[in-house]
Amino acid sequence: MSRYFSFFFLALFLHYRIIVASPFEGFDAEEDDVTDDSSHLLHHSLPPPLLTQSHSSLSDPDPEPEPSSAECKSDLITESDLEHQSDSKTPSSTPFEYWDEDEFEGLPVEIETLESPLITENGTHADPKTPDLKTSSEAQGDTNDQTKKKKSYAVEIACVCFLIALAINYFVGKRENESLALAWAAKFASKDTIFQKNFSMLGVSELEDSPLLLKEALNVFKFYASGRRYCHGLLATMELKSRHDLISRVFNLVVPCKDEITFEVYMNEETMDHVVFAMTKKKAAKTMQKEMRDLQRFAGIVSPPAGRKWVSEEFALISESKEVAADLITDTVLDQVFGDKAVDKYGKNFMSMHISDQHPGKHKKMMLFKFSLPDAKHMDDIVRLVALIPYYIDLVGRYRLSSQARNKTESGRQKAAEEAYKELHNARQEALQKKKAEKKKMMEEAEAKMSAEVIRKKEAKERARQVKKAVPKMKMSRSH
């Protein structure tokens, strides 16, 4: 009877050991799932133990005590709980699939999910809320590189756009200046125009097919005419805005300037009398008198005469005498351009007029007219101004001073000639003194480099020359 009880207790003990060991050894698949799920539910409350890979099959020297039946029952989870938990969350595969689970006994398997902490390269768990310093520094470096590239691209794009604007403005401005010059030539230098009627030869050469305009620069054009009495010829110079230069164009928007044309008439020496006369705007009268040497020396600002029709109040006259001013400002000129009634319409482009027989330069007897150019569509505004040129060529060529005015002008010119001679003589003396001083300095520097023997010989030679110079010369004569 005792033998039967022994077998019964032995079987009961073995059965109990199998039931208790199955959740830890992973032999039963269904119980493994239950254990995995239970460990997944409890992994937040229990700190994860260190995972070490076993290299031997040695048993643990300190085995854990066997759990009681109550503890085993508390670890079991029903099938309904498993189904409910599997519907709410699906666990992901473990990151250590290459490990053998049989080698880890008595340890809950921690399943890595999307919500589990990140594992870094050194095996430590990283907080997903804490940014990686290396990753953040690389991202910041990439952002800085992209910002620098954008800035460099912006500078390059701006430079390319500026170059394109320069090129476009160059061709457009060049075309505008050429169109303006051709419009002037078509209005005043073509067939049946003012210059064609008053001069026998037009253009830059004597050939029949010679061009009318000479282009010296992108904004400078010249026109030449000759073959008229009282003068050698006429040279017109158009100085236009630098429209081809983008910077000059922008500067002109801030400081406006005008297109100008200057006429230089070279008078014959024998036809032009003693005349120094100028006319300009009142604001520029004093400046013009200071800049022009002949006006500064011979002429002064003339006040308007009483009881006579005169130029508009916006003009000022600079003349050698009142007689010359009265003779050159005729009623025809006042009615056509410079009078109060005509100046607003026909004289708005007038800048200055200068007539002188003492003009500084190669040609002394000259007449200069300076006008502002309108645009190509309004060339009719300066028709009467251009007509003044042939009118004054004839007027000044025929003009003769009275005896009283001539004596006054001759005395002034004689005095000016003496002053000019003195200035020239003083300039020559200064140049000669400067040359002597330089020569003396060079000789002193050369003597400083000589030896004592050379200096002694030179002094002896100089004394002999002085003695020879002091001896009176005797002239030998032969008597017959």
Swiss-Prot record:
Source lineage: Eukaryota, Viridiplantae, Streptophyta, Embryophyta, Tracheophyta
A GO CC term assigned to this protein in UniProt: endoplasmic reticulum
Pfam annotation, one family: CCDC47
This protein's UniProt keywords: Coiled coil, Membrane, Signal, Transmembrane, Transmembrane helix
Main location: membrane
UniProt-recorded name of the protein: Uncharacterized protein At5g49945
Annotated InterPro entries: CCDC47 (IPR012879)
Membrane-spanning ranges: 153-173
Originating organism: Arabidopsis thaliana
